[in-house]
Amino acid sequence: VTLDEVINRLSLESSSAKIELLNFQNDLLQYENYKKSFLPAFVLNFNPINFNRSLRLLQQPIDGSYSYVEDNSNNTNFGTTVRQKISITGGELSIGSNINYLNEFSRKQNSFSTNPFFISYSQQLWGGGKLQRLENKIERAKNEVAVKQYCSNIAQIQQQALTLYLSAILSKMDSELAIDIKQSNDTLLHIAEIKLRNGSITEYDYKQMELQSLNLQYMYENAVKHYAESIQKLFTFLGIENNAEITIPDFDLPLTIDARLAIYYVKKNNPISNQQEIQQLEEEKNLFSIKLKNRFNGNISLNYGINQYAETLADAYRHGNTRQSVIIEFQIPIFQWGINKNNIRIAKNNYDASRLRIEKKMFEFENEVREKINTYDHSVKLWLTASRAYALSKEQYKMLTKKFSLGKV
């Protein structure tokens, strides 16, 4: 298993990546549903049975007396409605038709009431269009966040896979180094045994070599155990069987990272900027909504249609009566001891505080990116130094082993 396979294939096929893909698809579907909510919606209503048999208390219109009347009837209703949201004004337009059939069993009489055509429109007098535009901006920003968040989550999964892979690589290098040292020490122990027989070293020196050999054996066993555990963690995360080996890649790392270029791409691809934009838009929407509630406003509703009543279905659609209605409702705050003004000031303060928090968070985020860049540059320098020191230590150990075998140590 190579590093390229782990990052570009196996990590993307893991269960964690599949879960993120499903969540991302849900976010896309939610945004698609929001856009489709502005398309015409066709609704069919059908109520075949509404049966009632009971005694009802009614008041006579002539003398005002009360009497109980038996109600034994079934009411059937059928209707269609087409609804359309108007994004420019924030209102809603409805067009439809209804028919109602009443069967009175006690009187053995049937009747039809129809509404062949009706159209209605309702909206706020002021502010509905702006609220809808703010809502559109918020939903578009949420969709952009969903795309960038998915890419960010996948990158985090790849980062986790990379961390586990490098941990396994480090354990493998430790185990290989432990094997080399153990083999070299076994050779030294054999040479020390020969020198002990020849009287070149004391038994104390030989025991020291034997103790060192046991310590190296202990280190070797731990290194093998850690390597097996790290491999198991890596393969478990990737969701593959533990029957493969990993290869040590050739590290070709850039010595430094351009901070300005990195910050540019982070702002472009990281979802944090869009998340702050959403928060700002929501605070702006909340401020505007509170202003609407605490100032002069109202609602308007316009209705026009045709209705008729008859004992036969054909007559119920003849000579329809025109039905019109206009409803205008005003909300006029007169005097509330300054409560409305204070509510607006509270919302304005929350809006300003949100803007300051966003600026502070973006500044801290840029500093965090710069710190990571500095950490990377410093780590690369340490890695180059450690690589050279490791190569020199191996050469020194080989030279020391050779000197010991020649009796110069």
Task: Show where each model-derived region lies.
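Bacterial Sec-pathway N-terminal export signals of envelope proteins
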Residues: V1-N75, W126, L131-L134, R140, ...
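A glycine-/polar-enriched beta->alpha junction
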Residues: N8-K18, Q25-F42, G79-Q109, I119-K137, ...
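Residue-level recognition of short, well-ordered coil/turn positions
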Residues: S15, S200-I201, P271, K408-V409
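Amphipathic alpha-helical coiled-coil segments
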Residues: I19-Y34, N153, I157-A178, L189, ...
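Exposed, low-structure sequence patches enriched in small/polar residues
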Residues: L39-P40, L44, P48, K293-N307, ...
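Small/polar, glycine/serine/threonine/aspartate-rich low-complexity segments that form flexible
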Residues: F46-Y121, I248-T256, S301-I332
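Periplasmic alpha-helical coiled-coil/stalk elements that build and connect Gram-negative outer-membrane
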Residues: K137-Y265, T375, S379
